[in-house]
């Protein structure tokens, strides 16, 4: 029990709340077994506005999703639908659009364009003595505080939302600072921009690792090679190819 069925957290669906918060603990007590330290009740969900039914044919098969999108992306697509403690609707018809907007064009594109600039402008070797912009530090600190608070309270939807707001802000930072123009003009601020991007990306990788362990392992491996100066501009990460 201690290894395969620990009592730290008992996760149940709303429809069996009574049985698992009243009867199940009573059965455990009568058997002399430890009670759950916490019980998390997740909400019920519909699929594209309908109850999930084999007859209707709208059952979501996680294995099919993993085959189509990869296990990490499938996990994200499900967890990012709505807060787990609430009832909600899974927009399965929109999975491809959400994959492309959040993963391919979102975090995937941010990492790709940032790493390409680091390789192209500095051969991947950044001077760590350069400062990191305070606004990026402050943004990361705020995001991390909210992320950790949500994660510790099993608010995974909210934790992911915080990370993807940070991703959008880092994308906006690139567009505002225009590192390509700084490189063309030999502006010394370029190193500060690249270091700030690296700092932000390392935070993103750490935050997303519990949700996307395989993809973030790929990103960390790529980043290690980049820092060693082992990569060329044509060596793409290709984390989330468009669908």
PLM feature segments, named:
Residues 21-31:
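Short active-site loop/helix that positions an aromatic residue
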């Amino acid at each position: 029990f201690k290894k395969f069925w620990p009592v730290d957290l008992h996760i149940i669906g709303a429809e069996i709340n009574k049985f698992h918060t009243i009867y199940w603990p009573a059965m455990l007590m009568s058997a002399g077994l430890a009670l759950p330290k916490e019980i998390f009740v997740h909400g019920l969900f519909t699929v594209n506005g309908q109850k999930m039914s084999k007859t209707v044919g709208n059952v979501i098969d996680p294995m099919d999703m993993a085959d189509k999108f990869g296990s990490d992306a499938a996990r994200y697509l499900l967890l990012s639908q709505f807060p787990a403690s609430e009832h909600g609707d899974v927009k399965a018809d929109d999975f491809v659009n959400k994959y492309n907007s959040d993963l391919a064009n979102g975090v995937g594109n941010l990492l790709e364009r940032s790493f390409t600039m680091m390789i192209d402008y500095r051969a991947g070797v950044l001077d760590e003595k350069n400062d990191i912009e305070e606004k990026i530090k402050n943004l990361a600190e705020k995001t991390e505080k909210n992320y950790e608070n949500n994660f510790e309270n099993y608010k995974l939807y909210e934790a992911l939302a915080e990370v993807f707001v940070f991703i959008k802000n880092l994308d906006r930072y690139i567009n505002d600072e225009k590192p390509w123009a700084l490189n063309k003009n030999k502006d010394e601020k370029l190193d500060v921009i690249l270091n700030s991007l690296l700092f932000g990306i390392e935070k993103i990788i750490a935050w997303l690792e519990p949700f996307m362990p395989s993809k973030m392992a790929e990103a960390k491996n790529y980043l290690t090679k980049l820092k060693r100066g082992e990569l060329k501009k044509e060596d793409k990460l290709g984390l989330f190819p468009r669908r």
